[in-house]
């Protein structure tokens, strides 16, 4: 990463809370390296946050990040109140996690609660925290959600992704979160992924907010 830019999880958190929407990019959005750069730029200019994924060829991501890091540093200098955050998702093993950190992403998102190859599920949180990245591991079941939410070791992740949210739908998402309504969890970020679209977004937002959590769609 250029020395002119320093990763800051608090900057990511503040921006996520302000914007509330992350636009996920898959392989279909990246026919060429320039496609990724143009799409990320367009998402940023629209006032949202872009998340590329490791479904895109890693070589393409590396090439793109060389340019995107420069644009991010420039945006930070010229518009410090509107940072260009670079997120990456579909990170499924320690090698991809280390690659994401090395490439300079601000936010790293995993689709499941147990990253293949890690000794313990919580290793994801330890690694991203040490790298000063904003980390969001995935969960699906109540036990997986509680594993990250209810910790006494101070290793709660920055947010928790619920995948595949289409299985729950908005009302089911509310039912999943209801038992965990506690004052200490107020404002904790929950990111439903899968089945979130123009028809369902408002429902997910309402159900998550009603349970005291902060919805990031």
Please report, for each region that a protein language model flagged, where it lies by residue:
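Active-site pocket-lining/capping segments in soluble small-molecule metabolic enzymes
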Residues: 3-11, 191-193, 197-201, 212-217
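Catalytic beta/alpha-barrel core
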Residues: 24-28, 48-58, 83-93, 105-119, ...
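Generic hydrophobic/aromatic pocket-lining and core-packing "Φ" positions
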Residues: 36-40, 65, 97, 121-125, ...
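Alpha-helix-loop-beta-strand connector modules within alpha/beta enzyme cores
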Residues: 58-90, 120-141, 171-197
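Catalytic cores of alpha/beta
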Residues: 93-103, 142-154, 196-215
């Amino acid at each position: 990463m250029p020395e002119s830019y320093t990763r800051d999880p608090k900057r990511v958190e503040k921006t996520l809370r302000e914007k509330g929407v992350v636009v996920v990019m898959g392989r279909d959005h990246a026919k060429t390296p320039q496609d990724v750069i143009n799409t990320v730029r367009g998402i940023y200019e629209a006032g949202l946050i872009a998340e590329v994924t490791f479904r895109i060829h890693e070589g393409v991501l590396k090439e793109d990040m060389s340019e995107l890091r420069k644009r991010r540093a420039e945006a930070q200098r010229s518009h410090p109140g509107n940072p260009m955050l670079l997120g990456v998702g579909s990170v499924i093993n320690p090698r991809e996690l280390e690659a994401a950190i090395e490439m300079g992403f601000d936010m790293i998102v995993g689709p499941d609660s147990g990253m293949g190859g890690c000794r313990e599920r919580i290793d994801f949180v330890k690694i991203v925290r040490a790298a000063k990245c904003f980390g969001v591991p995935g969960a699906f079941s109540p036990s997986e959600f509680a594993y990250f939410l209810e910790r006494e070791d101070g290793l709660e992740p920055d947010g928790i992704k619920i995948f595949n949210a289409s299985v729950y739908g908005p009302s089911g998402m509310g039912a999943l979160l209801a038992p965990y309504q506690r004052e200490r969890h107020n404002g904790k970020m929950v990111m439903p992924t899968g089945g979130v679209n123009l028809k369902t977004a408002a429902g997910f937002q309402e159900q998550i907010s009603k349970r005291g959590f902060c919805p990031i769609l």
